[in-house]
């Protein structure tokens, strides 16, 4: 399903601890825009909706809606520094705008 880098797993664990969201899974969803581009959503969510798929990666519980399952397969969450700012990024080879990361 989703791969999680060590850096992203560490940052998610920090967020869980700060927010006290110990048992809530992390919901990941993708909306395909009219132009075919992907819009990503991610947040803690304790709802269990019809068609949801749940799984665990690096001790992080995830939930994905049925429409996003095929779109997230093979995706990696990473935590990187971009222009001096740290953020979680979605590295998704299924995304039409995906560019493989390069070392700088």
Feature roles, as predicted:
Residues 49-83:
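Mid-chain, well-packed structural core segment of small domains
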Residues 2, 42, 69-70, 88:
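Flexible, active-site-adjacent loop/turn segments at secondary-structure boundaries
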Residues 1-22:
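Long, hydrophobic N-terminal alpha-helical segment
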Residues 11-14, 31, 39, 63, ...:
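Generic detector of bulky aromatic hydrophobic side chains
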Residues 21-47, 56, 63:
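Short, structured protein-protein interaction patches enriched in aromatics and acidic/basic residues
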Residues 3-9, 37-50, 55, 96-98, ...:
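A domain-level signal for the structural core that forms small-molecule/cofactor-binding pockets
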Residues 71-101:
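C-terminal structural segments of small proteins and small subunits
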């Amino acid at each position: 399903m989703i791969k999680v880098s060590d850096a992203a797993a560490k940052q998610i664990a920090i967020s869980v601890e700060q927010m006290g969201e110990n048992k809530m899974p992390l919901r990941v969803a993708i909306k395909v825009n009219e132009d075919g581009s992907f819009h990503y959503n991610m947040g803690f969510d304790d709802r269990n909706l019809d068609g949801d798929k749940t799984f665990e990666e690096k001790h992080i519980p995830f939930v994905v809606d049925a429409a996003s399952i095929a779109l997230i397969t093979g995706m990696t969450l990473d935590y990187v520094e971009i222009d001096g700012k740290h953020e979680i990024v979605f590295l998704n080879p299924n995304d039409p705008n995906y560019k493989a990361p390069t070392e700088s």
